[in-house]
Regions:
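Helix-to-loop junctions at the C-terminal end of transmembrane segments
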Residues: 58-72, 158-159, 275-287, 373-374
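Central cavity-lining transmembrane alpha-helices of secondary-active solute carriers
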Residues: 46-64, 266-278
Length: 413
């Protein structure tokens, strides 16, 4: 089982690496690409907001389908969504660009990209819940390192060749995303009854795990504190999305350029690796609920630090807090949801995390961020983000309690 775990960790690391370099191109450099196509900040905000709104619809639908479907595997569902993204992106590259065409395709591509991210997490958890000791944090950290390298080089490429290089880079990266997802599967050894009993995988539990998945409304009625937690998650990610989307504007505000933006993104992503890679050991010492609260606090600290940054170097320094904010929150929240939510609704639970931190936060941050930038400037935008994130931290502290892992079986922490 250890050999299978190592193999699947590497394969999942390949998925995370390829996905996050593609995200770097299509999402983190979205403002750069769209500015070059003569979109203003408000229009960019609307495009990314509509993408997030569409993902709000797609994520629950795909999650419910994945929870209930007996014939279509989660991996095949992901591959279908990815071919859609690749086809749309190829159209955008081939066809002559117009305001309407770029807007519609960019919205669709980003909406589906946002949707597949939580499904990847569910894909990994399927194996972990069967007793495969994959190192999720290490695999996710590989994604961060890849994002860091891509941010640095893409920033340099844009300075040298212009923003038109972004789309071809994305297409090449996305071929790797499709390939890595196709390769992510492995046959597990058949367990003896004694091994099943040791792991708590008795026949009674298997029968219990085959219960019908809940509808969205019933799910939230059964998990009211989780719904409150999601509100807090959306609020702490509000500033995170603002900073990522409009980092080029923040850099220009303090005298920086596209290359500086790439360096800043690289610093943040490189520093994510230690926390993610060692999360499997950290979570044995500190409760996952405590880690989420700590990470939420550092989202607010990072936003406040960038608000006060007088120059490019201090913006770079502010990215150090990413190591305790985003880097801890990502694996901690996924482990938390896996322990909190019953098996038949786990894909839905992971997807709701995506709805909160990508869909809701992305919608509100991009919608208001562009308007705040055009009307009041960078400082007002960052101040708003810091206040919203601080409130989100308080909500998370109120709403999170350590889950009962025995109740839902298959806990990982």
């Amino acid at each position: 089982m250890e050999a299978i775990a190592r193999k699947l960790t590497l394969k999942f690391g390949f998925i995370q690496s390829s996905y996050w370099i593609s995200q770097c191109a299509i999402n983190s450099f979205a403002a750069v690409y769209l500015h070059a196509k003569n979109f203003d900040n408000t229009q960019i905000g609307f495009i990314l907001s509509f993408a997030a709104i569409l993902s709000l619809i797609l994520q629950p639908l795909t999650a419910s389908f994945a929870d209930k479907s007996k014939r279509v595997t989660l991996r095949h569902l992901l591959l279908a969504l990815m071919f859609l993204v690749f086809g749309l992106s190829l159209l955008l590259y081939i066809l002559p660009g117009s305001f309407l065409l770029i807007s519609v395709i960019y919205i669709l591509v980003n909406a589906v990209e946002f949707t597949v991210n939580p499904l990847f997490n569910s894909l990994a958890m399927e194996y972990m819940n069967q007793g495969v000791p994959m190192n999720y944090g290490l695999a996710r950290g590989m994604g961060s390192i890849s994002f860091a390298v891509m941010s640095f080089f893409l920033g340099s490429l844009v300075d040298k060749f212009g923003a038109d290089i972004i789309l071809p880079v994305f297409l090449v990266c996305y071929v790797l995303v499709i390939l890595s997802t196709y390769l992510f599967h492995d046959k597990l050894p058949v367990k003896s009854q004694e091994q099943k009993d040791v792991r708590g995988l008795s026949d009674n539990i298997v029968l219990e795990e085959e219960k019908e998945a809940s509808g969205i409304l019933t799910f939230f009625l059964d998990h009211k504190l989780f719904l409150l937690m999601l509100c807090g998650v959306a609020m702490i990610f509000y500033s995170h999305v603002l900073i990522n989307t409009y980092l080029i504007n923040i850099m220009e505000h303090v005298g920086g350029s596209g290359s500086d933006m790439g360096v800043s993104l690289s610093i943040a992503a490189f520093l994510e690796l230690p926390a993610m890679a060692f999360f499997i050991y950290i979570v044995k010492k500190i409760k996952v609920s405590t880690l989420i609260k700590l990470s939420a606090l550092f989202f607010a600290i990072k936003s406040f630090a960038i608000l006060l940054a007088p120059n490019v170097y201090m913006v770079h320094f502010s990215m150090v807090f990413q190591m305790i904010a985003f880097a801890l929150f990502t694996p901690a929240s996924i482990y938390f949801v896996n322990d909190l939510i019953e098996k038949e609704n786990r894909v839905k639970g992971q997807s709701m995390l995506g709805v909160a931190n990508i869909g809701v936060a992305g919608t509100l941050a991009n919608l208001t961020g562009g308007k705040l930038l055009d009307s009041y400037g960078v400082t007002a935008m960052l101040l708003t983000g810091t206040v919203v994130t601080a409130v989100g931290f308080l909500i998370i502290c109120i709403s999170i309690k350590e889950p009962d892992k025995q109740k839902n079986t298959g806990g990982l922490t």
